[in-house]
Every structure is written in structure tokens, then in C-alpha cells.
Amino acid sequence: MARKTPIERYRNIGISAHIDAGKTTTTERILFYTGVNHKIGEVHDGAATMDWMEQEQERGITITSAATTCFWSGMAKQFEPHHVNIIDTPGHVDFTIEVERSMRVLDGAVMVYCAVGGVQPQSETVWRQANKYKVPRIAFVNKMDRMGANFLRVVGQLKSRLGANPVPLQLAIGAEEKFTGIIDLVKMKAINWNEADQGVTFEYEEIPADMAELAAEWHQNLVESAAEASDELMDKYLGGEELTEEEIKKALRQRVLKSEIILVTCGSAFKNKGVQAMLDAVIEYLPAPTDVESINGILDDGKDTPAVRHSDDKEPFSALAFKIATDPFVGNLTFFRVYSGIVNSGDTVLNSVKSQRERLGRIVQMHANKREEIKEVHAGDIAAAIGLKDVTTGDTLCDPNNPIILERMEFPEPVISVAVEPKTKADQEKMGMALGRLAKEDPSFRVWTDEESGQTIIAGMGELHLDILVDRMRREFNVEANVGKPQVAYRETIRETVKDVEGKHAKQSGGRGQYGHVVIDMSPLPPGGVGYEFVNEIVGGSIPKEFIPAVDKGIQEQLKSGPLAGYPVVDVKVRLHYGSYHDVDSSELAFKLAGSIAFKEGFKRAKPVLLEPIMKVEVETPEDYMGDVMGDLNRRRGIIEGMEDTATGKTVRVKVPLSEMFGYATDLRSQTQGRASYSMEFLEYAEAPSNVAKAVIEARGK
């Protein structure tokens, strides 16, 4: 079957924003205007189509990035139908992993900002992730109808807070309750949407006289930005010639695709104004799969030979699984993005990361939580497969005859853990199954059993992250669980280099003995790098080469539980440079034990320290409560990084140890009568002060 829409008319876009910038409402309006949704779902009523988990509807925040397919031909029906896949991404900082995961499979993004709140903390995180994956983007300044809305202030913040190069594509006519429409700075016309049909139809009008001067100034800015796309256009512009509408659009598109500029649109999704023109901008300025760099990978040939897959149906099939979701009706749904080739339902594909074959039974295209079964998918498509058995997020699915492993996704280590136990013994098995399922869906969530206490431990990116997972266990799997006190994921490392540390394991009393002897140097590595490095510098065969991996293994086992307080050891380099062996008594086990003895000894001598996770916290508070908020943050060992005035008060940026932040949400609410809000994300590991380290080590020793 031939593809219905040529790949040049595909747009794979993400919609990304801070909480409450109105992203879900914006997505709802997109679905409405593209003809998928006949009644607009309001988040206020918990009825939005995109928020498809019960919890999201209760909390009014988006947790799962659902992928939706729709078609758009322009608000004046000026284009051929374009196939738009929308990935809805969460705006809460505990779900950064979801954002990262969806950024990986997008070609372009729409960043939604609140016209009142502007560029908020989470916006910066999302921006950094979009930079990391080189995602071209446009901005939509939403909520122009709200008190305190100011379009040009947000444009300024895009520059000052994100270091972006914003170019307004539109201006807002009026603001707050006087917001009536927008000015299209390319056409130099005002656009007025018809309220009677919820903004489906519109009229072009002349620009209001009181805005003519401002519009001319910003039109000039837009044309200048377009002219910078090429020397040829610049010469034409400087020569006083008018650039045509087509030339302006083509030039702006080139610059957006290179991420040199971010075009800024505006509107009010709630009032049905502006989303239609923003959709047109998606078509005109964001990339098709063929406009972005081809995806790189490695061949599964044992040599890791680099390979490329282009967005082309003729190339061998390759796809990336970017999300696993459990659906109450069909079981496992594996969302995947097809990078090259074609695959049909019923085909067998290879999961090249796990070297396992999987049969693609049914393929569905999702509209939030409704699904349509399709027979085949092509390069550029985003779809979900039902019933794949052993696929996890980040795995590659490909043609078994042309195996390739696409770039893997990297997932952060969890920073917080809690013990969980089922309320009834009968639920033990059910809880194990539920946690296994949830861990498969979310790579930033880990589950293990504590060997000493026998407790089940779950770990994640923040308190809210774990709350929601425990809540999902209750709702989706009917497992009620008791949750212990949150524990911080400390780490251990060393600060000094030590040389010639010996490790000897010798038992030679009659019969076959054991003998292993190693000499190592240990030194600290820079933080945030590989974490552990083992260098073999044995010359002259003082240790036979078949025993070298055993030494490494012995050390790696010690890394899991450090000598200070049993926390994982990071940022250590070990050089194995001398040792001795016995022809008969030496074995792998003996050298493994010798390696671990040397490591323990060296660690004690190398000035060991405890590292604690430091969080980047931003608090937005009305000015009246500023003193209380600052005093409280100081008590929590916070280091103030900066302060800014906002439309509603002050924003404070602070670095605070995670161990001091438990229960902060409740404390902040009571200090500010619920008027302040905060966001928190992991920043780095730093050395814990000696009094804190001492208390932690003593508590672990009990």
C-alpha cells in the first residue's frame, strides 16, 4: 500500500511547556481544529482528551506523553493536507524523563509560554533538552486574555532567560479582557476569529490605527531576520527592494531549521484565538522528517561500525521504541517512531539491543486514548504496537536482515528512594508484578530488594514521581502499599590519589590453595563523567592476562556498596600495575578477592567523602512572604543563586541539598498561605559537610 501523505508533508512535533501554561488546552484546540475532536475538552472539567490517565484528570497535570495523529490543511485551507503527529509532553519537573524521551523522537517543537508567568523554571529545563537534541522550535505565548498578560515581555524573557533569538511572527491586539485577535507581521493584516463557531472561521482586517506604528517596527524586525538567511536576500533588502511574502517565509523557515531563531506566535487557546495561526506556523516553519539530520546508529556486527538511516521508505526498516504504556484493554502498548523503511502488521522485526525477534501483531495510531488500527507504517510515522513482549524504552526495532542499533537514550540515575510493602501479604506477588510493569514503562524508576532488610525499595526522580507511581499501583493494579520515609541516594568518592596499594588473598594450608596478589593506584575522576575507570598496566606477565578481568570484577562489586556507609562509589580511577601469582593456587576467584581487598584498603587511604544530591530549586512567591521564604531556605542549607522580579512577586533561585527538601511543599504552603509555588530538579552531587556525613554514616552503621 502506498503512503497516503508524502513524507515532506509530515510534521512530528512536541508541545512542551511549564505546568499551567495551558499546554493541554492548546493541544485540545489543535485536535478540535484539525477535526478530530468535535466537542472541546476542558482541563477545568477533567475532560481533556490528551490527559488520559485518571490521575492526570484529577491533578490537572499531564503525566504521560500520549502521541496523537491529526491532519491540517491551513486555517484558510491554503495547504495540501499535512500529517501532524503530536507528542504531548509533561511540564512537571519530576517527569523530565518523559520530556527527554519525547524530544528524542521529535523533529520540531512548539514551546508554550504563559503570557503572565513568562519563562518559568521548567521552561529552561525543556529548552536545554531541546538544544541537546537539536530540535527546531517555535513559541506560542498563550493566555493573552489573562490579567497581567504581556506578549512583548515574554519575548524579552526568551532572550534574557533562555539566550534564544526570538522573532515575533505576530503581535497581540489588546491584552487581558481586551484581547481580540492578532496581527500577522508577514501579511501585515489583523486576524479576527469568529466566536460563533469557536474560531473555525476568521476574517483578515486592516491593522488598528493605534497599532500601525508598532506593527511596522516589528514587521521591519521580521524582514531583517529573514534577510539574514542569505547574502543574496541581504543585498536585495539593503538595496531597498521589498522581499516577497514567499521569500520571507522561505528564509525564516531556513533559519528556524538551523535553530538560529525562534518564531513567536501568540493567542488564547481557552478563547479559541491564535491556535489556528500557530498550526499554520507549524506547517510553514517546522521541519518535515526529511529536513532534519538523518539518524545515526551502529551496525550489530561486533565492531560497532557507524551507520546511518535516512527518512526514506526504500531504506531497511528501523524504528525507536520511545514509550511503553499499559492499556487496560489491550495490554502493553509500545510507542515507536519509524526512521526508515516500511513495516506491516504481522511482520517479524528484530529488537537489536536485546538480539530478540518480535512479531508486530497489531499496529495502532493513537488519538490520545482512542486508537485506530492500521496495516502498515512508513518512514516518519509514529505509531504504537500491541503486545510486544520484551521491548523497553530506548530499544531499536529493525529489519532482521539489516540489523542496526540506533542511538541509545540516556536516563538519569534516581535521587530518592522509599521502601514499599503491600498492606496485605496476599498482595506481595501482585505488587512485584505491578512494579515490574511500571519500571518497564519508566526507565528513571528503579525497583530492587534490599538484601539486608528484605524490603522492596523503589527509587525515582522526586517525591511526586514516587507518589504517582504508588498511586498508579493502587488504581491500575489494585495493590494498596505502605510507603516508608524517603531516603536520599548518597554517593561515595575519594579526594586524593594513593599509590601502590596491595591486595593479597592467600590461603595455602594443605591441598589446593588460593593465591591472588595485586598492586593498584587509585585516583579521583572529574565528577559527572564515566564514574569508574579501570586501567590495566601489567607488563611482563606479573599477573596472567586471564586473571585481569577478575580483578576489575572484584573492584566493581565493591563499587556497589562503598566502605564509608554502603552507598555506591563514583568517580574513581584504578590502575592495576603489579602483582604476583602462583602456578597452581591462583584462580579467578582469588584475584577477584585480591582486587576487592586492595580497593577497600585504597579507598580508606584516599580521603573518602560522602556526596549528597543537590537540587536546583526555584520559588515564586508574593513579595510579602519573601523574608519567611528566604529564612526557611537558609535553614535548609540553601545557597541563593539569584533573584528576579516577576509580574506576581519574586522568583528566588537556590541550590539546596535534597535531604533538606522533604515535605517542603507543605511547609511552603503554610508559610505563604498557599500563594507561593516551587519547582525542583536534580542539579549535581556535591560533598556533604562533615557533620551531615557523620550523621548519615552513623545512622547507616546502626
Curated annotation (Swiss-Prot):
A GO term, aspect molecular function: translation elongation factor activity
Keyword Cytoplasm among UniProt keywords: yes
Protein location: Cytoplasm
Domain of life: Bacteria
GO-annotated biological processes: ribosome disassembly
Record has GTP-binding as a keyword: yes
Keyword vocabulary terms for this entry: Cytoplasm, Elongation factor, GTP-binding, Nucleotide-binding, Protein biosynthesis
GO annotation, cellular component aspect: cytosol
Domain tr-type G: 8-290
Function: Catalyzes the GTP-dependent ribosomal translocation step during translation elongation. During this step, the ribosome changes from the pre-translocational (PRE) to the post-translocational (POST) state as the newly formed A-site-bound peptidyl-tRNA and P-site-bound deacylated tRNA move to the P and E sites, respectively. Catalyzes the coordinated movement of the two tRNA molecules, the mRNA and conformational changes in the ribosome.
Similarity annotation: Belongs to the TRAFAC class translation factor GTPase superfamily. Classic translation factor GTPase family. EF-G/EF-2 subfamily.
Protein name as annotated: Elongation factor G
Species, as recorded: Yersinia pestis
Gene giving rise to this polypeptide: fusA
